[in-house]
Amino acid sequence: MKEPAAPAPGAAASHRKNPLAAPAAIAACVIVFYWVPMTSPSASIQGDAADVHYPMQKYLSDRFSPRQFPFWTPYVLSGYPLLANPKVGAWYPPNWPFLLAGITPRSIQLELALNALLACLGAYLLISSHVENRMAAMLGAFAYGLSGFFAGHASQVSLFAAAAMFPWLLVAYRRAIDIAPVRYTAFGGLVGGALILAGSGQAAVSSFLGLGLYAFADWWRERQGWLRDVAIIGFMLAGALACAAIQLVPAQELARESSHAADSSPIVEGFLHPGSLMTLVAPDWLGAISGGIQAPSGAAQFYFYAGLLVLPLALMGAVKSGVRLPGLFLIVPPVWYMLGPAGGLYYLGSLAPGLRSLHAPVEGWFLAALGLAFLAAAGAEWIFAGWRFPFLPVLVAGLLFVDVWYWNSLGNPLAYVRASFDELYGSSEEAGRAEAIKQPQLTRFHAPANRVSMGPKLHPLDLKLEATYGASLLDPGPYRDYLDAMERNPKLRDGLNVGRFLNVATGRIDENASVLARAYFPKAVVDVRSLAESRQALETLDPAVKSLVLWPHAPIRQDPDAAAMGVRYGEQWYRVHYHAVSPSLLKLSVAWYPGWHADLDGQPLPIIRVDHALMGVIVPAGDNEVAFNFHSKRFGTGLAISLASGLVLVMCVRVGRPSHHRKRKKHRHSRRVTA
């Protein structure tokens, strides 16, 4: 087969004749692909999408106000800094229309569809910068944005959204190299910021590593310009981190306080098993479609099907196309690393802090998925160029779309559940509402999080049920210590203000007659010098008798008759009226966290740790009222950085001009196909 000639100037004009035709066709196909889960009353989200993302986003949407954001919620983990958790997706721009309109289970499905559209459009723009045939680029877009990775991770909304933004990161880099360095480097910073704000740190790390691999493919082919490439990537990364500071700064504080902060144990699951690669050609190989799941750690992680034509087309593209390098670099190193210790590269990669933090390496498969889509498009272009049958491109792209439409949507239980949200959670939510009504005011409900059936796992947010648990949340370490000790020392329930609890032995909900008030004065106070000492003391602590106070603190002469005579409260504040005849410790049974402030008549009172995980203040003698308020210490800093950097990047996008040193010649060569 002869090598096709480079396109003539007239051909380029023809290619640009209808620039919106392909994106419009892609949008129509995505709507068709998601039509059933978006509109059917017998389809719903499932897994973490229903249990975690929906309750968090609904909580945020219900409380959205320009003057007040729900930085703190009292309903999970005895108080929790909700907006510090990246999974909420509060600052991810594509989520904003849904948050403003009001979140329902259907809203989450619409978010998935929108992100799938972004994934397809980004892949199309990237691939079309390397191949001339628009139908080949559309085929590649379907092979990525509608691939098995997205079907298998439909319940992981943050990861899904971040993977959807990944092609746009590469598009920004490609255009920074080829067209306007300043404009598109700044655009890449904005895209990278959105990718981070999607809420998946693992996907963000993988994406920037993928960007590095894509750029390395450029250098490998040209063997020049590496300093320029590194500078562009560096500025894109810096811009992304700065734009995402509104989320990263509070999240860094939460991670530091987290029970997982000191966990450096090696990854023991989430590696790529070679047998799972069979799902590239046989979607039900692991039983994901039929329901007989045999995957090592669940079928969703190991479901890769992107169409029966993708693998042969990708092999054709790798052999025959002159644009094989970007695709191969996106496939080979990531897959090698995902194999884990068995592959060898994992040991080298684990030396890097970013890679070490990856929970499940196989969740970086979207890099390989884009590489396969890239090579499949290149292979398709080679075939279309050689076999000049007019309808062949439309036929092949259409066959691939119908293929993935069935296997990754209509017939795939990983993509959505075939039941309404009410059918899944309605009865348990009703039971939860009934229990929430019975809960005495200003007391908490305690149960092992995985043993409660009251709706989605984060049902306390929707039920407004103050609870000690919170599934799938990054919990502060001292609070986790307290809950662990409470399993061995039930008296700690009293100090945590637990009024009712699930009796695991009987399966019934019991009353706790000895519950202590939300705000009270302990009978006695004992100093502890370290968190390790207070953690050990929890094993025998009786909060009704005494409380532990972390040193240093102001002098205490505990008044045994001091009393908290009235408590007013909101979701992010408390007002406690008290009487004491000497400086005494007032304990507030709320999880300690940076950002809580207390003041008395406008004078600040230091917040101190009480009973290892809770908080309190030392109040002066008298008859006064103490005000407790939560204000995130880090949000203001992050907001200022994000606004300033975002403004600078937007200005750079607007004023950046095309470079006089664009490498058009290189890309005319890269678009060619070789015999």
Predicted segments with their positions:
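Active-site-proximal, structured, solvent-exposed surfaces of multi-pass membrane proteins
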Residues: 14, 53-56, 545-666
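Conserved luminal/periplasmic juxtamembrane motif of membrane-embedded glycan-processing enzymes
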Residues: 2-578, 583-591, 668-670, 675
